Amino acid sequence: MMTERTFSIIKSDAVKRNLIGAILTRFEQNGFKIIASKMVRLTREQAEGFYAEHQGKEFFAPLVEYMMSSPIVVSVLEKENAVKDYRTLIGTTNPETAEEGTIRKDFALSQRENSVHGSDSIENANREIAYFFTDCEIFER
């Protein structure tokens, strides 16, 4: 098995409710190493750029506004099967249908305010990591 990296966002709703520590703890309890992490406040340009694939969809503008509404915490996580395991840990986008014990089931408020984002492929993880981090901000552990 190869060690993989994935990208995580602790979103505005979770940051506002002081859930950063609880969510980071879940990452570590599930075998992820946090090899980079920082709090950022997205500009409109950053939010639109990050979600560019959704431009033109009806939820794009509200999503951009939501992601700009308060700081977020972006992280790079590492472990074997990181992308798949992280997606399992966070649960489905809609917290109502997420499995018990997942981050979204436990913390999300709604489908939009779903507390976390996770890369859906290794390719997207690499792109998303590079969007927020330089190589010198990522530390092997």
Swiss-Prot record:
Cited SUPFAM superfamilies: Nucleoside diphosphate kinase, NDK
Name of the gene this protein is made from: ndk
Reactions catalysed according to its record: a 2'-deoxyribonucleoside 5'-diphosphate + ATP = a 2'-deoxyribonucleoside 5'-triphosphate + ADP; a ribonucleoside 5'-diphosphate + ATP = a ribonucleoside 5'-triphosphate + ADP
Binding site for ATP: 11, 59, 87, 93, 104, 114
Subunit structure of this chain's protein: Homotetramer.
Annotated catalytic residues: 117
Species this protein is from: Haemophilus influenzae (strain 86-028NP)
GO cellular component terms, A-Z: cytoplasm
Family to which this protein belongs: Belongs to the NDK family.
Name under which the protein is recorded: Nucleoside diphosphate kinase
Pfam short name (any one): NDK
Required cofactor(s): Mg(2+)
